[in-house]
Regions:
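Short acidic, gly/pro-rich beta-turn/loop elements at beta-sheet edges
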Residues: 18-20, 45, 58-59, 102
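Residue-level detector of flexible, active-site-proximal loop/helix-junction positions
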Residues: 14, 55, 99
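A broad, low-specificity signal marking well-ordered, structured residues that form hydrophobic/aromatic
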Residues: 6-8, 46, 87-93
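GIY-YIG nuclease catalytic motif and its immediate N-terminal context
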Residues: 1-30
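Sequence-level motif detector for i,i+2 pairs with an aromatic at +2
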Residues: 3-5, 43, 84
Length: 178
């Protein structure tokens, strides 16, 4: 089971099943993703935030935005396990558990974000971006169509639930006949 504030590696199959030009590349299952939250209304849907080590590129974007007097809720730079990383909140996407390849580990230890202030800051930014996405607001020209992916994931969850119920019914019918 996924745990909030841990980092995970996404299976490449996700990017095959949901091809979107603007989804961040998975770097051969080496890009860590931060598990931000589980959807309250759809507990099978999890939202993850890709990370990047391209600090200068994103620091420049943040500085330009802040120079205009605006805050930057789409990106967040912080230290993760002794290394600066960028949380690409603008590129967060929904996922289901079967597409999680494994926990992201350092020296065999699963990486977890522990600093409560960092968790609150990221959560606040994630909530803002999620609310924009839910309302269908396009805020980036290179924004992946994550709501289309979410809808497809919800359809797949519904199909799996129906198939599971049919299996249960078939099993109980077989046991009744015995």
């Amino acid at each position: 089971m996924l745990q909030e504030h841990y980092f995970y590696i996404i299976d490449d199959q996700y990017f095959i099943d949901f091809p979107d030009t603007y989804l961040r590349g998975n770097h051969q299952e080496n890009r860590p993703h931060y598990f931000a939250f589980q959807e309250p209304s759809n507990p099978g849907i999890f939202w993850v935030v890709p990370l990047s080590s391209r600090i200068q590129k994103y620091r420049s974007i943040i500085q330009k935005k802040e120079a205009t007097g605006k805050s930057c809720d789409t990106l967040h730079i912080m230290d993760v396990a002794g290394k600066e990383e960028v949380f690409l909140i603008q590129d967060m996407f929904p996922i289901v558990e079967r597409y999680i390849k494994r926990e992201y580990t350092i020296s065999g230890i699963p990486l977890k974000l522990l600093n409560e202030n960092d968790i609150k800051t990221i959560r606040k930014k994630v909530n803002k971006v999620y609310n924009l996405l839910i309302r269908g607001i396009k805020f980036m020209p290179t924004q992946p169509n994550v709501m289309k992916i979410r809808d497809e994931l919800l359809k797949r969850i519904a199909v799996e639930e129906v198939l599971s119920l049919k299996e249960i019914a078939a099993t109980s019918d077989n046991q009744s006949e015995s």
